[in-house]
């Protein structure tokens, strides 16, 4: 096969001249020009006039970090023939006998001239900093000091496109670091502090008792400084936000800081650079670039010392607390802080020292906050396969409508470059808001600090604590005008946001029910991302509408928690959850799609069957399953790589400093190479499946696929980029980037992105294959039987004269899929029959099941298994049973377990009633309702009354499929003969015991876990109490009390005993007869319908009481 020519062969290669300056290939030198100038340090003898001067070199090799232990002091390179100065008539210097250790002779023929690579002289201006004005001097005892002034400057590029330099005033003399001290090589940081020598105390001999002094830059006076006096405006008792509000003020903004103007004016240039940014980003850990080091100051330094165990120093004027890390370790440090939930920013130098020299003297190296990373916006590093979402929520009250609250929301996956926006209506239970939070599973939630109700804040705290990792809740100050609908539209249009979206942002928003509140939430998200310097994400991101419930089986947040869909109730982890059971996906995109499908089970019979067809084909053809798995293992995270590639088109990388910009370009080369090779594996998979004609035909019905072969096919298009990668970036995994490579990469990416929509379709198709293959693996590897469900449409009410088809739920051999015992023993299978049979000979079963049984008998497990079977079926997955027939379920409601919410002030019974109220308000005929021990959170009589009334309402008014588990045994007698209720119980048995046991507990209770006809006579709570370890004496007392209460309370239910012989069915007959008799009593003619009614009643009575011979 002839090798495909590179797509770049049609373009003329750019020359070096045309590409010069696009990407700087020079690494940022340690220059350190901003870290602090080179200073002359003068050492004097404590007992003589002789003094020796030596300059501290600022070469790259001599720059040191503050987080490393003291090392051997670097020695100054002096010109050949250098001799220390001696004072006439005085003894030798105190250091004269060891000066040879600090002096290294320069053998180069430089005529005694100092190298000017690291030192740039300045003129005597306000920006000049004399060494003796800044660095403490070692004075002789007679006070004489030899002075040799050297001034220094910093330079950089003359023009910086799209870069706003941090405003600084250059008229304040001082060092070039926020630590208020110049960076200098260390003699255990002796040069950081001025040492005053006395005859009775020499600091070198007693270094543990040094006295730190402050050299006044103006008058040169020395004065002792107490720790913390320089930054009293940072102390907790004095700190204020930008509006001068204290932390106890409800409107206090913890993101900003007020710096007194007089203090800011006295700061040096670099200090102003740092604090002007920090005052607006107090919630961010800010790394400040100084030469070849990144440093943290004050509050951030404390955090670095605490979290990263870095050594903290008290360096600089005012004893500024400081920690630091070298360039090589910054990425690892940032990832550690992100993993612990911190937000991290980096203030970079925009020039190197060489560029600074080129601009001339009297210059300040400009710096800029170029990057802010947060746990919710991370796009690189170890972020895992799960989607990382940042969510913004806005709430408005709709008092005139049935649903009193509307929530607008917007969220983003920065790694995949995808936005979603939508709105939901909710009631006081906040069930819909809980569903949103469970579906999105955000890392961080932005909400209006004053516009969110107390109920919504409770829901935020409740549903964001269900997982094993904490979610950050970030209140956002309300800013009028920036987040209203009109203002947001203006911001999007004026800044060109979402220009790279495959769909217009107007289409995503305008179709929503409450688009204004959704736009407000989107505005909050945009403001936040702009603050984090993520303009590329906003400009190139795709935006889509998001529907929480529409077109799918509704599963609210509480139901997801009760059924343990994503997080277990033990430790909040994934073990023992539905997601974990079905997750056999190989690719990261498949894992994310699986979660999305579980949140949105289908409600369309045709779509469900299309998925089931592919699953059945996989289970029947193991070879296709194996081939698919082999290709999927080769795939990288194509979705995130495509987002990364899209964000690089016309990005802001050109304004980054040379070293950082080169690093970003190197990452882009690697990402582009990976995505091209990854799509090759993906397309090869689809082409291999085309040989399996049946599989590919099923896949085309399920997904939208672009043309793969032919002149316009993706296969030929992709091969051109493969050729370009092989020729121009053969070592793309670790390619050194030149100016020519940068322009080549830009051309390739722009051509590749032209078919971004088609690439997204390929990714979605491959992800669907991965998920459906995962379903097939779950069915194949299951320890119990798995069956393909038979799905019927939702029930449709017809005219009274026509037969009405109601909902059905018929599952035989049902078992809980992930309740397998440790020894591998399966749960006992059971049959669930609710509603009208569609395939049988017209048999009809009641839609409501009243379930009783002993504690620990398996009632809750059966309830959960039933719900999970419905979710399995409507996902398009095989169901853990022998056979399954169901009509579509529109909503699953659950009221399981007993729990209170102490932190939100809600008791167990209030939680029960709130969840039950949501069921009564929203349940329909096609819903599945699961109620477990309703009413146990209050007194016996109140609980029984509520359980009775709720059950009767759902049975007679809603007529939905329902499983109602209870320990109120009189309920079974109340509904014993009700035609729409069937009573069953979880069976148990007893085994005699030889040892002594309390009265009534002399037999062991054996749980059979099998669903059996009829009601259970007791709950056998005393036997369970013995099993739990309650002492025999206590149980015996309880047994006596139970017998007494039964005799007392039994009288109150005597009427129920009598009514069991005159059931609800008889009441219906009597009502019909009375109705007809009233018509006859009023001399009204008896119509044909009345005769039909009488005939039906006669037939029902005859069939009920006449036993066939």
UniProtKB/Swiss-Prot annotation:
GO terms for cellular component: nucleus. ATP binds at residues 853-860. Residues 19-45, 61-86 are annotated as: Disordered. GO terms for molecular function: ATP binding; ATP-dependent DNA damage sensor activity; mismatched DNA binding. Belongs to the DNA mismatch repair MutS family. Component of the post-replicative DNA mismatch repair system (MMR). Forms the heterodimer MutS gamma (MSH2-MSH7 heterodimer) which binds to DNA mismatches thereby initiating DNA repair. MutS gamma recognizes specifically the T/G single base mismatch, but not trinucleotide insertion-deletion loops (IDL). This is DNA mismatch repair protein MSH7. The gene is MSH7.
